[in-house]
């Protein structure tokens, strides 16, 4: 059955032009920004809010943020007042990588906006992210 199949030589020139000589990844001058407004929650009890914030701290989608925020939530959320919980809730509405870079004080990658410069919650998160105890970071138990 396969005796009559001829071998084919497939060759190409050593020179391949992609995108007709144009750069593969063109530089765009315009910055695309899209912000999805957070859900406005009304009538949420403080216990439900704490539980939601713990969940949102653990399930960010980026491991680095998950580790920092879940550890922070485990340590501090139970003692936060309503105002502190509201501020932490607003912080969690920010993009994951921004929170990570702000927590690690890496402002050259993502500059810190004015609205977070005097945040005591962010300062507490930054102190926690320094990991002065040199603990191995892992997700806290539920």
Swiss-Prot record:
It holds the Pfam family Sdh5. Signal peptide: none annotated. One of its GO terms (cellular component) is mitochondrial matrix. It is found in: Mitochondrion matrix. This protein may be expected to contain an N-terminal transit peptide but none has been predicted. Interacts with the flavoprotein subunit within the SDH catalytic dimer. Plays an essential role in the assembly of succinate dehydrogenase (SDH), an enzyme complex (also referred to as respiratory complex II) that is a component of both the tricarboxylic acid (TCA) cycle and the mitochondrial electron transport chain, and which couples the oxidation of succinate to fumarate with the reduction of ubiquinone (coenzyme Q) to ubiquinol. Required for flavinylation (covalent attachment of FAD) of the flavoprotein subunit of the SDH catalytic dimer. This is Succinate dehydrogenase assembly factor 2, mitochondrial.
